[in-house]
């Protein structure tokens, strides 16, 4: 055991010379069972629509284009497809899920339902939406979109109540009052059905203030009732504001079943699209790469707010996004982050990805996978190391055996050489 302190000292010296195995700022995977959701920065098919035709607009290495592990669409995002007519059917499956999208719905787009609305509320909606997506994709393998069929027995049609620029809200649908309704005080219902998935993410939205019509103010009131279980989900507007009047959305995770959408005032809303969650898996944190513009455009931090441990690891560049194709496409820092998809890594943590599973100078926080056993270098000036004792002891024994073998061999050759000299 006299070798053990020496071995620890040698280990510390090695660590002080640079063998730290530090966490790296990349997204990666432990094996080939992974999937990436993205936008133009990982959309390999977008090359046919751009000039010049080259892959420098992507942050993704083109080697991965034929992997079959990417669902990306230029100009879109999962949130944008979920709520608006500008739709792309994001679909993918994997044990390890990576997200690099969200920039196509930011304060730069300035969406709000009406002139007196508030884009801040839509940024809040975005954060709440991605929180549900990230949490659930840590326990589900498969994500896709499904249409939600509904039946409304009245004659009124759905109306595009919320639109701004090229964005038109169609989820949830808004059904206007019947022609014979004297005002907005009325009860109305519609049936909708969820089937074919393990669970669904659906929107439940209400206006956050008072709606003025014909000198009267109305409060929003929306409910979903599960007719199979008797569970009711509902919201009533309680705010008195009349400016900044916009749509607050909550994102429910619901099982399959028959539902009733109910409104007691203002307008009836009913979901038309849902995130379909399928195939339960062992808990595996998702990885999210910050999705933002160059500083010349306004971005938000909602994906960072939504991505919290233990269900999510967030990766970001420390510098401004500056692309080589154009200012918003082909940034070196984000290309470096996505380069981790080219190889397997044994360990993931809040701090980053560890390339090796032996020792490290950093304790992995919220670890996943086969992670290093080293704990910490407690003093930056004096390399005082704390290691998991088992591998240290085993390595010490191996080192001791090696030293004994070397000593025996040296003695053997010394004795053999002495014998030869004596014989001479």
Curated annotation (Swiss-Prot):
It is a single-pass type I membrane protein. Coiled coil: none annotated. It comes from the Viruses. Residues 267-379 are annotated as: Esterase domain 2. Residues 7-127 are annotated as: Esterase domain 1. The chain crosses the membrane at residues 393-413. GO terms for biological process: fusion of virus membrane with host plasma membrane; viral life cycle. Residues 1-16 form the signal peptide. Glycans are attached at residues 54, 89, 114, 153, 236, 301, 316, 358, 417. Residues 17-392 are virion surface. One of its GO terms (cellular component) is host cell plasma membrane. Pfam families: Hema_esterase, Hema_HEFG. The active site is at 40 (nucleophile), 326 (charge relay system), 329 (charge relay system). It catalyses: N-acetyl-9-O-acetylneuraminate + H2O = N-acetylneuraminate + acetate + H(+); N-acetyl-4-O-acetylneuraminate + H2O = N-acetylneuraminate + acetate + H(+). Keywords: Disulfide bond, Glycoprotein, Hemagglutinin, Host cell membrane, Host membrane, Hydrolase, Membrane, Signal, Transmembrane, Transmembrane helix, Viral envelope protein, Virion. GO terms for molecular function: host cell surface receptor binding; sialate 4-O-acetylesterase activity; sialate 9-O-acetylesterase activity; sialate O-acetylesterase activity. Residues 414-424 are intravirion. Residues 128-266 are annotated as: Receptor binding. InterPro entries: Capsid_hemagglutn, HEMA, Hemagglutn-estrase_core, Hemagglutn-estrase_hemagglutn. It is found in: Virion membrane; Host cell membrane. Belongs to the influenza type C/coronaviruses hemagglutinin-esterase family. Structural protein that makes short spikes at the surface of the virus. Contains receptor binding and receptor-destroying activities. Mediates de-O-acetylation of N-acetyl-4-O-acetylneuraminic acid, which is probably the receptor determinant recognized by the virus on the surface of erythrocytes and susceptible cells. This receptor-destroying activity is important for virus release as it probably helps preventing self-aggregation and ensures the efficient spread of the progeny virus from cell to cell. Homodimer; disulfide-linked. Forms a complex with the M protein in the pre-Golgi. Associates then with S-M complex to form a ternary complex S-M-HE. This is Hemagglutinin-esterase.
